[in-house]
Amino acid sequence: MKKRKLSKKDWEIIKLLKKDARMSDAEIGRRIGLSKSAVRWRRINLQKRGYLLISAYLRFDKLGYTYAFVLVKIKPDTPRNEILKFKKALMENEHTFEIYEVLGDYNVLIGVFGEDVSELKRNIQELIIGQKCVQEYKVLLGAKSLKGLEVPFWDALED
């Protein structure tokens, strides 16, 4: 994938939106020295190009939900279409909150949640058991979220 360059102003907009995704274009403009319309154009352009996604980040630990990260090793001889089918199922599952392709001993990292440990276990089993492409997996139970999607959870350090 080709590396894309962002301007200094684009990075400033992104930095402010990471701190407060609801910040108005006018407020961003005041802080970085651009007009409201210039900020709006840049923000919309970043969103249209797929570089910027504004979304909510659910804090499972704050809600009392149980969550885990599942490391999955894909069988080396698995046909590409089987792997894509598995990844699509992960992406469509309502209990997955993060999915990454990773390098190392495992190929995929999946964030999964449930209301309690029993539901979490069921959700993980539904994702993994019976998948022909899965060679092995490892579950890491989440204890506390300190940072997610580049946003530090400073209050998590207080406990």
UniProtKB/Swiss-Prot annotation:
Pfam families reported for this sequence: HTH_AsnC-type (PF13404)
Superkingdom field: Archaea
A single GO cellular-component term on record: cytosol
Keyword Cell membrane set for record: no
SUPFAM superfamilies, alphabetized: Dimeric alpha+beta barrel, Winged helix' DNA-binding domain
BP terms from Gene Ontology: response to amino acid
Domain HTH asnC-type: 6-66
InterPro entries: AsnC-type_HTH_dom (IPR000485), Dimeric_a/b-barrel (IPR011008), Tscrpt_reg_AsnC-like (IPR019888), WH-like_DNA-bd_sf (IPR036388), WH_DNA-bd_sf (IPR036390)
GO molecular function: sequence-specific DNA binding
DNA-binding span(s): 25-44
Keyword Calcium recorded: no
Protein name: Uncharacterized HTH-type transcriptional regulator PH1055
Gene source species: Pyrococcus horikoshii (strain ATCC 700860 / DSM 12428 / JCM 9974 / NBRC 100139 / OT-3)
